[in-house]
């Protein structure tokens, strides 16, 4: 039997591929159209396991684009390799193929109360946000990410559900 140290087990766990955006806090079970945890739409949460790779990639890409928009408005990642090193050293899971701004979100989401110097992680806050505490900034990131996801749903998804329901009612 092979024995691994705790550090090696954490390393293996942190580098397992992330197969779903789920963060374990699904609010769609309570009727939300957009999950407050992972920001997927209710039908994406329900149908995820039936999606093919292209459908899953489309969801991942939308989530990435919205999150990057939120993050770039408040901070700059100036050293991607340092950020990656810090994530790996702290066993924080991240999607390697995503933008470093998504990585920054993962780091801040998990370490906002412990991080004292963002520059040590390859990031810096933009001037208008330098007086914010990281836990408040983390909450602002999450709130804006949710609001953008909700707006996207209302603009592009809800009208098609309404149209489909009306067409079925006429059938």
Regions found by a protein language model. Give the residues of each.
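Intrinsic disorder/low-structure terminal segments
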Residues: 3, 10-11, 93, 128, ...
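Generic detector of well-ordered alpha-helical segments enriched in charged/polar residues
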Residues: 19, 23, 57-64, 84, ...
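Extended hydrophobic/Leu-rich segments
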Residues: 1, 5, 94-95, 118, ...
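N-terminal cysteine/histidine-rich coordination modules
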Residues: 2-76
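C-terminal, charged low-complexity interaction regions
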Residues: 115-171
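Short flanking/linker segments adjacent to small metal-binding domains or redox-active Cys/His motifs
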Residues: 71-128
């Amino acid at each position: 039997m092979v024995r691994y140290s705790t550090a090696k087990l954490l390393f293996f766990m942190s580098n397992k591929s992330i197969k779903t955006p789920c963060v374990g806090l699904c609010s769609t079970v309570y009727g939300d159209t957009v999950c407050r945890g992972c920001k997927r739409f209710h039908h994406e949460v329900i149908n995820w396991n039936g999606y093919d790779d292209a459908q899953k990639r489309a969801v991942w890409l939308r989530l990435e684009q919205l999150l990057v928009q939120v993050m770039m408005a408040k901070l700059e990642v100036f050293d991607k390799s340092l950020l990656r090193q810090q994530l790996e050293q702290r066993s924080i899971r991240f999607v390697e193929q995503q933008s470093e701004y998504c990585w920054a979100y993962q780091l801040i989401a998990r370490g906002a109360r412990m991080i004292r110097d963002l520059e040590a992680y390859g990031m810096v806050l933009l001037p208008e946000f330098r007086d914010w505490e990281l836990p408040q900034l983390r909450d602002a990131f999450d709130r804006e990410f949710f609001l953008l996801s909700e707006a996207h749903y209302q603009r592009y998804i809800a009208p098609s559900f309404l149209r489909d329901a009306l067409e079925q009612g006429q059938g």
